[in-house]
């Protein structure tokens, strides 16, 4: 991304993803999915599971897993999701941290910001609370489950922008997954990625500013 274009369109609001962006919950959540998928009979490595599931809505993950599990018991999908929610919640309570620089960033922002996520509101509130971020975010949580629009659909970001009182072109999106990056680009927003270039569609790379840490954002807003 051309940094000059970002500076020419001032950033007046920020929309963060949650898992893997503000909260270091992506890895433990993906690990739980990997453990449960392999226990159900799938043969995939931890790295393959992370690549397959990261940033993908749970319904699509469940469809992918169920299609590969032979001789499924009745209510397999509902039971799997219930067990995943319970197990991941316990894992979060055992050990969960904010992403490096997250508290410092959100506590010092002078422009409106919120969190837009493909995760359920209850889970997001829990992880933000466990990491000390919830007081800064407040009720500015936009869950795809509440609004029926999941990334890469840009609708959730556009809703967040309207609620924050800004036009899309003056909003920044901070993401760590390909579906989130696609949604941010489609929304016409400034897009910052904690996800490396590998695996990001080439056609959007020129519209994404790749960063290595949240502290890199200090010079932008």
Tell me what each language-model feature is:
Residues 1-12, 107, 111, 120-221:
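Asp-based, Mg2+/Mn2+-dependent phosphohydrolase catalytic module
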Residues 39, 65-104:
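Metal-dependent phosphoesterase signature
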Residues 2-51:
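Active-site neighborhood of HAD-like aspartate-dependent phosphohydrolases
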Residues 39-43, 69-75, 132-136, 165-166:
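Short helix-capping segments at alpha-helix termini
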Residues 28, 53-57, 97-101, 119, ...:
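Short beta->alpha linker loops
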Residues 19, 26, 47, 96-99, ...:
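A short, glycine- and basic residue-enriched loop/turn
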Residues 34-37, 57-72, 127, 161:
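Helix-loop "lid/cap" segments that line or gate small-molecule binding pockets
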Residues 24, 115-117, 193:
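Hydrophobic residues in well-ordered beta-strands that form the structural core
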